């Protein structure tokens, strides 16, 4: 599998997790020039923008440690455009992070809510 296919695999796993938690998935892989949102979902009155990361070897950092300031800035830009394009001003924006780690042949999903001030 190439890098993009692997990314889709982890996003599908994250989407399954979110659906089980009651989230309504609105969009996947929303892209603008200079930014991308992996998953957009609704959780009650919240419009949730989710960044998904995977690590099979955490010796180089956990999934959450891979989100740098440049990624945060591009994510904020994409969020503003998404809200404007879809007229979703009535929902409270929230940024969540899903980190997927592989240990042996098992996968662990870590979900962190409200990780980025908006």
From Swiss-Prot:
* Pfam families assigned: UPF0102
To which species is this protein native? Answer: Carboxydothermus hydrogenoformans (strain ATCC BAA-161 / DSM 6008 / Z-2901)
- Supply one GO molecular-function term: nucleic acid binding
Protein name in UniProt: UPF0102 protein CHY_1414
CDD domains attached to this UniProt entry: PoNe_Nuclease
Looking at the record's lineage, which domain of life comes first? Bacteria
Q: Matching NCBIfam families, A to Z?
A: PRK12497.1-3
The family assignment reads: Belongs to the UPF0102 family.
Record Gene3D superfamilies: 3.40.1350.10
């Amino acid at each position: 599998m190439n890098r993009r296919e692997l990314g889709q695999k982890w996003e599908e796993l994250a989407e399954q997790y979110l659906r089980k938690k009651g989230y309504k998935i609105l969009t996947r892989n929303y892209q603008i020039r200079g930014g991308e949102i992996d998953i957009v979902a609704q959780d009650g009155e919240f419009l949730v923008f989710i960044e998904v990361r995977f690590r099979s070897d955490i010796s180089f950092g956990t999934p959450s440690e891979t989100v740098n300031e440049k990624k945060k800035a591009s994510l904020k830009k994409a969020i503003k455009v998404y809200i404007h394009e879809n007229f979703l001003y009535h929902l409270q924006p929230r940024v969540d992070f899903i980190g997927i780690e592989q240990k042996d042949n098992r996968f662990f999903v870590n979900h962190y809510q409200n990780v980025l001030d908006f």
